[in-house]
């Protein structure tokens, strides 16, 4: 018997005559090609009965069998069967729609807290609703859309309404036959499933089979909600799967669906919050975005008037206009909480409106008001005990990453059925099918934070519940974003005024324990020996502002001497300025400012809220406040900052002396401005380069026009300029600009110059060589890698090396010098007047032919200590010549780089001899070389030799066999002075060249 998935098809096939069935089978040989599917062998088709043919089709063409048979019915002139099949399909689709309508009407009524008429809700989300229709109605191809916004802005409510409207026949009717709605966080305890099982769990009886439903993926929409609270990592994976029937780990199924590996023809509508956007968005293909903007001031008033009767609503709306709570009420969930809180207050016949500057104060008012309405006359001790059970449930769920609770979870945490009924009435909890959830995930975070204020030493320890230091570590050092809201409440509840709100219902709650735990954690984090570093400082600053406790804020920020901040919005700039202006200990600040912060593009009128307009208006003030601390810093790193002209002018003003801040008060020693899109007209240089302690200036990746370069050079020539390290890599500096720079450095204090990754060409180097020949030039290091140089540049450098007495490091890496160019350099190095100590020549297209000259230099030059020849084709012959030179008693070389060079393991004997005879060699880089085991044995014998003085060997141990890795580990154990490292010089070379990566918070 064909499985239930093919029962409907079998009934239709049985209506075919034998002749029609034979013709049907013959046509089936060709039909798969129309659907771009692999054909079934004719032998299998020919020998099939009607029953076995259905099984065959469902096995080979899951999800396509129904459509294929509809087409074949028409071809055998049985249009009646095709019509009958389509009617069956429509009937079952209608059943599903009716079932979903009933389900989501219940959810909308019982679980969705709009508390206003539907017509009023549609007016509030009119823009987003139109966007949803346009996105899906205008496209016939699969679409992925995101509903984005901050927590509590109504994303889930919007999606529930969309689902209800589709099921009611008023939305996307011509686009989708099936719409499935899943809250993905409810899968947190499901380790394995198939997409077919997930879909089946939502289907009523007598629905189409999953095979039939998925036969036309273009008519299917998946609405996925709750990614902020999903515990699974959905990062890009190589083991994705296209089989929707196969049971797989939950994260593989979800990731395969999101990345369109599984059911690529379906459409997706996803709810993504601030936590999930950076984790999920990059997995999606060309997503369209619908942004929930929150309530405008007008919408808040409209909501209040809809929530209450007209007269009371007007009174509430008028009061809100002058209430600090208004900016919080732009969040729809908080607006609902505010109105609910007032309703309870009015029911108790209490006068006045509560005020709240922070989320913690807001939620505390809501929670206390709910308790007063139910337990007004209960002793505070009883209320505290009741509250503690709810808080324990919340915090246990947070640590387990659990947001959907069963009856056992409630019972284990001391919540009885009668307690549950009270929490449901208070709207702290709500039902979720047969399970229970908090009324909003943010409410769970609030009660979880409250747990730490109710906790006592005598309490029984629950192993799964972490300590405050563990919680803070997850938030600020390990980047676990699901804890951020809890952290905001934890800091907010520290406030004495917020604690006072709790006292009437719950007695005296002392926040000092939590405060001390927080301070202790950051004290440890700020110590150098701590393995963890602060990663989310902007979140910390937001939490500190929510505490509203000046002394506490100062105590925390003064524990941190170095901070990295990613400023992505005006609000982040605001909290950063608030926190850092209170620091007296900060020495190093690494700052990244995104383009949107200083953008002059405003939102459309319908998106404007009082909050958003205020933020834009105050951005300049926040920036000025932050700039005010720069004079006290020792290191300022402006990495990939996107400024407008006004912001640059404010930066310039902050670095200028005033009557209250004289020039001598500025402590800045190091300034980096890498990858800045706009450096202004260059007038900033005059201000910066007069700072009395500024010794280091790095502009890597920041384009400098000719005019800006000239202003930089003018500032360098000023006698007040004390810059010693000037790093101008990747600044678009031409040969002509290089000439101007060279002239400005003749009488300057600059000792280290990096011009890497600029098209200087030979003409530019000629100008630099003229500078080097001037007796007034004090330059000691010159970095010229990737500067489009040829052997001709080496002719100019030959003369400069002979006349300059200060230059000790010359980097010519990754230039087309060839053997001819290096031979010219060797002639200079053989001269006793040449004082160069380090020569970097990696990737210069060298062969073994230049190694004879280099070897001669190693023998006769007593000054050269470092020679880097990596990534050159010097072959075995070249390595042997170098090893002979190293073995010479006159050789003084200390560091030799042969990483990525072309040579074989046969050279290991020569290297071993050099290691045991050269008394000065302490660093040998063979990184990226995978020597065979026999060669490695020879090398390791030399490393264990008592005459070997090597301290660093560059090798990637992980690239070798287990046997070879064990050999290298044994060498390190026996020789305590030796370190075998991968990328041994990477950081040092990067620092010397001044190169930076494009912004990353971990850079």
Swiss-Prot record:
Residues 1-91 form the Pyrin domain. This is NACHT, LRR and PYD domains-containing protein 9B. Residues 143-465 form the NACHT domain. GO terms for biological process: blastocyst development; defense response to virus; innate immune response; positive regulation of interleukin-18 production; pyroptotic inflammatory response. Sensor component of NLRP9 inflammasomes. Inflammasomes are supramolecular complexes that assemble in the cytosol in response to pathogens, such as rotavirus, but not encephalomyocarditis virus (EMCV), and play critical roles in innate immunity and inflammation. The core of NLRP9 inflammasomes consists of a signal sensor component (NLRP9), an adapter (ASC/PYCARD), which recruits an effector pro-inflammatory caspase (CASP1). Within the complex, NLRP9 and PYCARD interact via their respective DAPIN/pyrin domains. It comes from Mus musculus. Coiled coil: none annotated. Its main location: cytoplasm. GO terms for cellular component: canonical inflammasome complex. Pfam families: NACHT (PF05729), NLRC4_HD2 (PF17776), NOD2_WH (PF17779), PYRIN (PF02758). It is found in: Cytoplasm; Inflammasome. As the sensor component of the NLRP9 inflammasome, plays a crucial role in innate immunity and inflammation. In response to pathogens, including rotavirus, initiates the formation of the inflammasome polymeric complex, made of NLRP9, PYCARD and CASP1. Recruitment of proCASP1 to the inflammasome promotes its activation and CASP1-catalyzed IL1B and IL18 maturation and release in the extracellular milieu. The active cytokines stimulate inflammatory responses. Inflammasomes can also induce pyroptosis, an inflammatory form of programmed cell death. The gene is Nlrp9b. InterPro entries: DAPIN, DEATH-like_dom_sf, LRR_dom_sf, NACHT_NTPase, NLRP_HD2, NLRP_innate_immun_reg, NOD1/2_WH, P-loop_NTPase. GO terms for molecular function: ATP binding. Keywords: ATP-binding, Cytoplasm, Immunity, Inflammasome, Inflammatory response, Innate immunity, Leucine-rich repeat, Nucleotide-binding, Repeat. Predominantly expressed in the intestine, including proximal and distal colon, cecum, ileum, jejunum and duodenum (at protein level). In the ileum, expressed in epithelial cells. Also expressed in oocytes at all follicular stages and in preimplantation embryos (at protein level). Although expression decreases in preimplantation embryos, it is still detectable in blastocyts.
């Amino acid at each position: 018997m064909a499985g239930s998935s093919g029962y409907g098809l079998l009934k239709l096939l049985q209506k075919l005559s034998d002749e029609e069935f034979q013709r049907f089978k013959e046509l089936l040989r060709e039909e798969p090609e129309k659907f771009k599917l692999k054909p079934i062998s004719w032998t299998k088709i020919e020998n099939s009965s009607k029953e076995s043919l259905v099984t065959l089709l469902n096995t080979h063409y899951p999800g396509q069998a129904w459509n294929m048979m509809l087409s074949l019915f028409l071809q055998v002139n049985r249009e009646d069967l095709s019509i009958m099949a389509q009617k069956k399909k429509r009937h079952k689709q209608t059943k599903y729609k009716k079932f979903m309508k009933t389900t989501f009407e219940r959810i909308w009524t019982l679980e969705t807290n709009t508390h206003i008429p539907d017509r009023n809700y549609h007016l509030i989300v009119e823009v987003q609703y139109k966007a949803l229709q346009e996105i899906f109605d205008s496209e016939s191809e699969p679409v992925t859309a995101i509903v984005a916004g901050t927590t509590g802005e109504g994303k889930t409510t919007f999606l529930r309404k969309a689902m209800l409207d589709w099921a009611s026949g008023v939305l996307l009717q011509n686009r989708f036959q099936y719409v499935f709605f899943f809250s993905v966080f409810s899968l947190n305890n499901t380790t394995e499933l198939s997409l077919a099982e997930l879909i089946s769990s939502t289907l009523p009886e007598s629905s189409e089979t999953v095979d039939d439903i998925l036969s036309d993926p273009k008519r299917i929409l998946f609405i996925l909600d709750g990614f902020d609270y999903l515990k699974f990592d959905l990062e890009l994976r190589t083991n994705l799967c296209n089989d929707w029937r196969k049971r797989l780990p939950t994260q593989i199924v979800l990731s395969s669906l999101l990345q369109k590996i599984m059911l690529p023809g379906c459409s997706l509508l996803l709810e993504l919050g601030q936590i999930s956007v950076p984790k999920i968005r990059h997995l999606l293909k060309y997503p369209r975005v619908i942004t929930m903007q929150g309530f405008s001031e007008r919408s808040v008033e409209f909501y209040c008037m809809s929530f209450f009767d007209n007269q009371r609503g007007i009174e509430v709306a008028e009061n809100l206009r002058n209430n600090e709570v208004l900016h919080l009420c732009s969040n729809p969930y908080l607006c609902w909480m505010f109105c609910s809180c007032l309703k309870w207050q009015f029911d108790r016949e209490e006068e006045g409106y509560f005020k709240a500057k922070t989320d913690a104060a807001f939620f505390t008012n809501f929670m206390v008001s709910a308790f007063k309405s139910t337990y007004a006359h209960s002793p505070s001790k009883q209320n505290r005990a009741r509250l503690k059970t709810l808080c324990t449930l919340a915090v246990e769920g947070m640590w387990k990453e659990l947001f959907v609770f069963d009856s056992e979870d409630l019972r284990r945490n001391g919540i009885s059925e009668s307690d549950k009924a009270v929490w449901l009435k208070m709207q702290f909890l709500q039902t979720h099918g047969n399970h229970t959830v908090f009324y909003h995930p943010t409410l769970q975070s609030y009660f979880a934070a409250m747990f730490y204020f109710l906790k006592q030493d005598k309490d029984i320890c629950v192993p799964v519940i972490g300590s405050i230091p563990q919680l803070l570590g997850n938030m600020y050092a390990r980047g676990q974003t699901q804890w951020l809201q809890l952290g905001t409440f934890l800091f907010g509840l520290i406030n004495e005024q917020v604690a006072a709100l709790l006292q009437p219902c719950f007695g005296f709650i002392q926040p000092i324990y939590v405060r001390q735990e927080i301070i202790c954690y950051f004290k440890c984090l700020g110590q150098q020996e701590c393995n963890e570093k602060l990663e989310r400082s902007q979140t910390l600053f937001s939490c500190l502002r929510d505490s509203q406790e000046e002394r506490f804020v100062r105590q925390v920020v003064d524990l941190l001497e170095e901070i990295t901040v990613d400023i992505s919005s005006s609000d982040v700039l605001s909290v950063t300025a608030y926190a850092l202006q209170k620091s007296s200990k900060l020495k190093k600040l690494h700052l990244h400012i995104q383009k949107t912060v200083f953008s002059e593009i405003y939102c459309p009128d319908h998106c404007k809220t009082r909050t958003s307009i205020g933020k834009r208006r105050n951005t300049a003030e926040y920036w000025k406040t932050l700039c005010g601390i720069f004079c006290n810093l020792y290191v300022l790193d402006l990495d990939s900052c996107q400024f407008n002209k006004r912001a640059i002018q404010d930066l310039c003003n902050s670095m200028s002396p005033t009557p209250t801040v004289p020039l001598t008060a500025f402590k800045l020693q190091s300034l980096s401005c890498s990858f800045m899109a706009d450096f202004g007209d260059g007038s900033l240089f005059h201000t910066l380069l007069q700072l009395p302690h500024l010794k280091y200036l790095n502009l890597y990746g920041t384009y400098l026009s000719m005019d800006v370069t000239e202003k930089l050079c003018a500032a360098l020539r000023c006698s007040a300029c004390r810059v010693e390290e000037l790093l101008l890599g990747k600044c678009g500096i031409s040969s002509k600009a290089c000439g101007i720079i060279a002239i400005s450095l003749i009488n300057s204090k600059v000792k280290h110059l990096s011009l890497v990754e600029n098209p200087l060409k030979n003409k530019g180097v000629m100008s630099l060589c003229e500078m080097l020949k001037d007796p007034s030039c004090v330059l000691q290091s010159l970095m010229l890698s990737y500067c489009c140089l040829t052997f001709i540049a080496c002719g100019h450098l030959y003369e400069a090396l002979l006349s300059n007495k200060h230059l000790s490091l010359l980097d010519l890496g990754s230039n087309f010098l060839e053997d001819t160019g290096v031979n010219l350099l060797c002639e200079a190095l053989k001269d006793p007047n040449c004082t160069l100590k380090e020569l970097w020549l990696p990737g210069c297209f060298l062969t073994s032919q230049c190694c004879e000259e280099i070897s001669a230099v190693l023998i006769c030059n007593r000054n050269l200590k470092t020679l880097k020849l990596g990534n050159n084709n010097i072959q075995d012959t070249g390595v042997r010549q170098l090893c002979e030179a190293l073995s010479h008693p006159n050789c003084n070389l200390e560091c030799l780089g042969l990483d990525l060079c072309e040579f074989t393991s046969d050279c290991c004997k020569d290297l071993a001899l050099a290691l045991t005879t050269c008394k000065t060699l302490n660093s040998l880089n063979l990184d990226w070389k995978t020597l065979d085991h026999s060669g490695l044995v020879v090398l390791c014998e030399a490393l264990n030799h008592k005459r070997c003085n090597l301290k660093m060997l560059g090798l990637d141990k992980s690239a070798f066999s287990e046997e070879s890795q064990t050999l290298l580990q044994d060498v390190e154990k026996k020789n305590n002075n030796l370190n075998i490292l991968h990328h041994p010089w990477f950081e040092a070379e990067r620092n010397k060249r001044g190169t930076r990566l494009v912004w990353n918070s971990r850079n």
